[in-house]
Regions:
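Acidic-enriched and Gly/Ser
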Residues: 1-206
Length: 206
C-alpha cells in the first residue's frame, strides 16, 4: 500500500494528548478539539511515497503538522476528520508536513527543516527578555546544513519571525526552515541554553 506522493502515517498513541491523571481519575484539559496544542504530533511511518526520494523510512517515528491528525467541526457543526484522513487510523502526510524523524533513538530533521534552542539573554540593559533574540544553538540539523559545516551544537542566527515553537522531549525549540539560518557564530564561552521550567516538566511533545 503506497501513495504516489504522500507518506502514510499512523498516530503513535492517540490522535489527541488531552488527558491528565488527577487522583486516579482522567481529566480532559481542552475545551475544544480546535486547540492545536492538544493534537498529537507523533506518528509512525507505515508507507513512503512511490514518487520522489526521502531519507524517511517505514517504521520511523515522526513529528508531523498538527493538522494531520486533527478533527474539526464544519459549518453545520458536524465533526469531521482532516483532509489527511485515509482510513482506519491511517493518514496521508506531505513531505513538508514532517518536521522530525527518529531512527535508532536519534532525532533528525528532513532537508527542509531544522530546530534551534534559544540561549539565555545576558544583556545587562535588557532585563525583561529571558532569551536572546534571533540566536540559538542548533539542536537538530540536516544534511543541507552539514554541507555548510553547520552541525548540531553550532551557535547560529536566524531570520525574524521564522521560528515556530515546539516542545520536543521536554525541550522548547524553534522549528524553522533551513534557509532561515543566516549565520554561524563563534562561541564566546558564556552562552547558556534557555529552557523555561514549564517546558521541562510538561511531559508532552507538541
Amino acid at each position: 500500500m503506497q501513495s504516489l506522493f504522500n507518506f502514510i502515517v499512523q498516530p503513535k498513541n492517540k490522535r489527541y494528548e488531552n488527558e491528565v491523571d488527577v487522583d486516579g481519575k482522567k481529566l480532559i484539559v481542552n475545551t475544544t478539539m480546535d486547540d492545536h496544542k492538544y493534537v498529537s504530533r507523533i506518528g509512525i511511518v507505515k508507507s513512503v511515497p512511490i514518487i520522489g526520494e526521502s531519507e524517511i523510512q517505514v517504521g520511523d517515528e515522526v513529528i508531523v503538522h498538527h493538522n494531520v491528525f486533527r478533527r474539526f467541526y464544519d459549518v453545520r457543526g458536524i465533526e469531521k476528520n482532516s483532509s489527511s484522513y485515509f482510513k482506519e487510523d491511517l493518514y496521508f502526510c506531505y513531505y513538508n508536513q514532517i518536521f522530525l524523524y527518529k531512527r535508532n533513538n536519534e532525532w533528525k530533521a528532513p532537508f527542509e527543516f531544522c530546530f534551534v534552542k534559544p540561549i539565555e539573554n545576558k544583556t545587562k540593559f535588557v532585563t525583561d527578555q529571558k532569551e536572546r533574540p534571533l540566536i540559538g544553538v542548533l539542536k537538530y540539523g540536516n544534511s543541507s546544513l552539514d554541507a555548510f559545516k553547520i552541525s548540531e551544537g553550532s551557535l547560529v542566527g536566524f531570520s525574524p519571525s521564522s521560528e515556530y515553537e515546539f516542545i520536543i522531549e521536554n525541550d522548547r525549540l524553534y522549528r524553522m526552515q533551513t534557509n532561515d539560518i543566516t549565520i554561524k557564530y563563534e562561541y564566546k564561552g558564556d552562552e547558556v541554553e534557555y529552557n523555561p521550567s514549564w517546558a521541562s516538566g510538561c511531559g508532552r511533545t507538541y
